[in-house]
């Protein structure tokens, strides 16, 4: 028996629940809850090293699951891709059975969507001599951020990745991550905001105290947006050091869920 079955079947349900409204979602902090029970806080704050981001973190506070509510004007190419997205979340929501969210096919969410949505589960940050690694409970994937002084690969556009290519360095007490080479099939968020293969992303992490991590992001993609998209401040809270759950999207289970729940809810009936 696979231990992750219930978690994977939960994923589409979560998407439907998130489709209710942005306002409702915006008022419900994701931090500190799992399965309807509040998790214990990580403990009182103690002295910390601001250059050490290690720990298990979860999204906290009142913040939308995208860069900000003020998306920049799109280019004609960007607008066409946006109009073609059929989302199950927010003001443009359609029944999930009628949507085309790549996540509905178990495609990887990619970055930055994992930072917005995946971190409503948990994100662990691990540090070694030559890299910082983000490990996401949602999808159970890890993302290396190289800190050994290497440059971003010059052939990144020819070999795009779901998570892109990332390098990081410290600017005072701020950890700055620059990334390129993202697969353009991913969406930026649950609203269906698109990006092109030329998207560049900068993340700026700052550990305010032992228990609080802040993040701001800047997206630059002249093919899709008329100007850079700067996020509001995202806040994460330190969580107890507990085992990470396996939250996978399993195609075989997704297919069963679609036939039994999602398609009938959208008025699609498959004849036997």
Give, region by region, the residue ranges found by the protein language model.
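Bacterial N-terminal signal peptides that target proteins for export
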Residues: 1-12
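Bacterial N-terminal signal peptides
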Residues: 10-20
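PEST-like low-complexity, intrinsically disordered acidic/proline/serine-rich tracts
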Residues: 20-272
């Amino acid at each position: 028996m696979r231990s992750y079955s219930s978690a994977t079947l939960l994923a589409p349900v979560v998407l439907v629940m998130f489709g209710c409204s942005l306002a409702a979602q915006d008022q419900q902090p994701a931090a500190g809850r799992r399965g309807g029970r509040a998790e214990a806080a990580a403990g009182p704050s103690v002295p910390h090293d601001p250059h050490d981001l290690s720990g298990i973190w979860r999204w906290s506070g009142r913040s939308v699951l995208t860069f900000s509510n003020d998306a920049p004007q799109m280019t004609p190419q960007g607008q066409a891709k946006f109009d073609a997205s059929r989302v199950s979340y927010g003001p443009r929501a359609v029944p999930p059975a009628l949507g085309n969210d790549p996540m509905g096919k178990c495609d990887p969410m990619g970055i930055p969507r994992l930072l917005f949505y995946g971190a409503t589960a948990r994100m662990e940050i691990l540090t070694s001599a030559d890299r910082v690694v983000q490990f996401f409970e949602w999808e159970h994937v890890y993302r290396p951020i190289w800190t050994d002084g290497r440059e971003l690969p010059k052939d990144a556009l020819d070999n795009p990745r779901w998570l892109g290519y990332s390098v990081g360095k410290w600017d005072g007490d701020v950890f700055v991550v620059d990334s390129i080479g993202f697969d353009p099939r991913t969406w930026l968020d649950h609203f269906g905001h698109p990006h092109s293969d030329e998207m560049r992303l900068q993340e700026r992490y700052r550990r305010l105290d032992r228990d609080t991590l802040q993040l701001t992001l800047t997206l630059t993609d002249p093919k899709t947006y008329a100007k850079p998209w700067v996020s509001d401040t995202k806040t994460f809270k330190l969580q107890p050091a507990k085992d990470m759950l396996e939250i996978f999207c399993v195609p075989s289970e997704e297919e069963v869920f679609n036939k039994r729940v999602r398609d009938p809810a959208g008025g699609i009936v498959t004849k036997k």
